[in-house]
Amino acid sequence: VRRLAGGAQRAAAAAAPPAKRVRTEDTAPGADAAAPGADAEAAYKAALGPLQYDDADDAAQWRLPAAAAPRPHPAFRRRLAQEHVDVSHSLPLNLASSAWCRCHPSRMDALRVAISAPEGTPYAAGVFVFDVRFPPSFPAAPPSVTMLTTGRGTVRFNPNLYECGKVCLSLLGTWEGKGGETWNAETSTLLQVLVSIQALIFVSDPYYNEPGFEAQMGTPVGDHRAAKYAATVREHCVRWAMIDQLRNPAPEFREVVRLHFAHRRDFVLADLDAAIADATRREAAPAPAAPGPPRGVAGGPAPHEPQFWRHHRATLTELRQDLQRLLDAPPAPAPAPAAPAPPAPAAPA
């Protein structure tokens, strides 16, 4: 896979104008040293950058459909190779949000991607894993993307992310909301899909991703419901995209997860402290008294639910303690490779 992608990369780079050629060298650490937080940013990129794109060592557990064809059409292979080039050199890599890709060692049409969710959201710094498959009809049809971080099929992290792993996105043809960008065989790419997941799904107020709920924006009731939804999402994120990732990382992203959280430790704990403080403030807030429509009805004051925020504060506090223990524990040794199967006994004479 990497050999085919490398050939496509060299051809594309040679054909591109000098100003638009893909830069293949890593940016030198410290090149942006004048920027705030540049040291932490440079250290993160130096540690996680070399791990952004690679073949999976063992893809035996991947669920794979039948191969696209015994001998895929050359145009299909060329387009897949170009997709690999784009992903291998253009995935986002920042403290605020990053992505990593692993390729099936013998199938160009199968990838696995890990995304660290953006800061400023209830998903911040959590690691979410997705399977990507390119159908035989690609690029006429979009790739299929399935989320694997689902709390073992129990958690819906977003109106666009289902417990079964379904990802609803207009680019994928799985969502038909207004204003969504649809798949274009000539111009749409997997990289575009991944960036859309980061920007359009992992958002600060996921409650409003539900069609029709945007009408509640800016109202006391809408703000209250959005805050409760985000609070519940944050609990799920800490439990499944942080704690469970540290305890049971996907084998192909084990080192990514370890290094990511080693570099993001202080941010993650501070972000949780801020969320706990916010829950404490909401729990202690007096019930608003206002004339007009009943409480909890559109146009009226927000419901007063100190018990929800009390429970949320207690849950986050417990999760934070569990997470800090994992973050401060010495790294666990990588599991030993499985022993080869013993040879079959010789047939009797």
Task: Outline where the language-model segments fall.
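UBC/E2-like fold recognition across ubiquitin and ubiquitin-like conjugation systems
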Residues: 1-125, 137-349
